[in-house]
């Protein structure tokens, strides 16, 4: 099975508290007839305490329409993309020319040539690098991207591939729109980038990981030491066991963009938590293919759509209270980063202590990546350590 070898994240240098951003928006919009009570209630309801922004806050007032916003997006997206991929390659000491596939995903700006093509002029990839730009999947593209790269590596098991996500949601803000959806969006979404290195199971890096896993398992078998069990956890990388796509018919108006002459206007319906609460049969069906139940999953990496969505997923799957607190913390500290969020959560997971193995009969640790987005749809990826 394909394996996730390493992850990296990058953020703009500009970080602001929610109070700072709300105050600036309130001051600008009150001149346009803003209902301050509604604004304050919605800004507080998203539970975000701070976010990274692509530009200094004062620069947003100078942007005049989609052309300015998209140009700013392209500049910062390339800077973050170059930084996060360079960091990823440095972590693994893997030369850029050994990467065979580069998949990029974004939904917050438009570029032709696309981001990964432009990055080939900044990073020493091979000229025959295969490139796949994703656009339109929105928030679920981080999980979907992992799934599609893993599908590719099953066909090319001796290769290495990178998934890049760059989302600069702040540059889609509609400055003249006082709708509830835009007010929520203005308080919910942040900016950032993430990259993930995956390899097929015949790649040298995968073999190194597998050898380390086997050696530590053998040591534990003969010594029975919990200390060595923890060492095994630290050395093993997750395998991408499988993926599942879920589509809810006749729901295209629930979430997405309304593409206007002023740019990308948020479409955000009230039905998102309702769809989130309907995930259980789909997740259970997916897990049953591997003889697993919900209680066998010890690592949940769920996209932070918003506090109501997180609560709906947790209750809908009948997960123990606080199971998704990692996601809540992410939302609180840096907001919803669209497709980048779940990859940032993956990075935090792989670089921190993992929960104990769940399920009395489980030998391995299982994790679930779960994201929802436009269409309305969801994407699941099952991980195995």
Describe each PLM feature range.
Residues 1-75, 160, 169, 175-277, ...:
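Condensing-enzyme catalytic core mediating Claisen C-C bond formation in acyl metabolism
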Residues 111-117, 163-184, 242-259, 306-315, ...:
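Active-site-adjacent elements of ketosynthase-type condensing enzymes
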Residues 84-99, 281-298, 317, 349-357:
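Phosphate/pyrophosphate-binding loops at sites that engage ATP/ADP/AMP, CoA/4′-phosphopantetheine
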Residues 42, 46-125, 131, 136, ...:
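Conserved beta-ketoacyl condensing-enzyme motif
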Residues 108, 121, 126-128, 133-154, ...:
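Claisen-condensing/thiolase-fold acyl-transfer catalytic domains that form or cleave C-C bonds
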Residues 68-72, 104, 131-134, 181-183, ...:
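A short glycine/serine-rich beta->alpha loop
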Residues 1-2, 96-100, 127-130, 155-161, ...:
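Short coil/turn connectors at secondary-structure junctions
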């Amino acid at each position: 099975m394909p394996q996730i070898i390493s992850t990296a994240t990058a953020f703009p240098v500009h970080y602001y508290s929610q109070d700072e951003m709300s105050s600036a928006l309130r001051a600008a919009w009150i001149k346009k007839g803003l209902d301050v009570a509604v604004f304050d209630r919605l800004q507080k309801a998203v539970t975000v305490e701070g976010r990274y922004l692509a530009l200094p806050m004062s620069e947003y007032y100078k942007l005049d329409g989609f052309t300015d916003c998209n140009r700013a997006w392209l500049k910062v997206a390339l800077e973050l993309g170059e930084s996060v991929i360079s960091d990823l390659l440095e972590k693994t000491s893997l030369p850029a020319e050994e990467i065979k596939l580069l998949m990029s995903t974004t939904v917050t700006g438009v570029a032709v040539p696309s981001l990964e093509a432009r990055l080939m002029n900044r990073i020493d990839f091979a000229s025959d690098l295969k490139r796949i730009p994703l656009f339109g999947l929105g928030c679920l593209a981080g999980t979907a991207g992992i799934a599609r790269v893993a599908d590719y590596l099953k066909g090319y098991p001796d290769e290495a591939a990178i998934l890049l996500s760059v989302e600069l949601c702040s540059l889609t803000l509609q400055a003249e729109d006082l709708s509830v959806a835009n007010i929520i969006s203005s308080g919910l979404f942040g900016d950032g980038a993430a990259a993930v290195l995956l390899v097929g199971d015949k790649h040298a890096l995968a073999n190194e990981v597998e050898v380390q896993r086997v050696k530590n398992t053998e040591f534990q078998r003969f010594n029975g030491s919990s200390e060595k069990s923890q060492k095994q956890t630290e050395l093993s990388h997750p395998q991408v066991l499988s993926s599942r796509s879920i589509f809810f018919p006749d729901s295209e108006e629930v979430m997405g963009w309304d593409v206007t002459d002023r740019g990308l206007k948020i479409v955000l319906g009230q039905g998102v938590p309702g769809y989130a609460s309907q995930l259980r049969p789909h997740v259970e069906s997916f897990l049953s293919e591997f003889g697993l139940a919900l209680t066998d999953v010890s690592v949940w990496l769920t996209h932070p759509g918003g506090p109501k969505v997180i609560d709906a997923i947790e209750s809908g799957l009948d997960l123990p209270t606080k199971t998704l607190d990692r996601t809540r913390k992410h939302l609180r500290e840096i907001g919803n980063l669209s497709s980048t969020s779940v990859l940032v959560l993956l990075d935090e997971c792989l670089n921190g202590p993992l929960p104990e193995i769940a399920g009395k009969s489980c030998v391995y640790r299982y994790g679930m990546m779960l994201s929802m987005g436009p269409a309305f749809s969801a994407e699941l990826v099952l991980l195995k350590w």
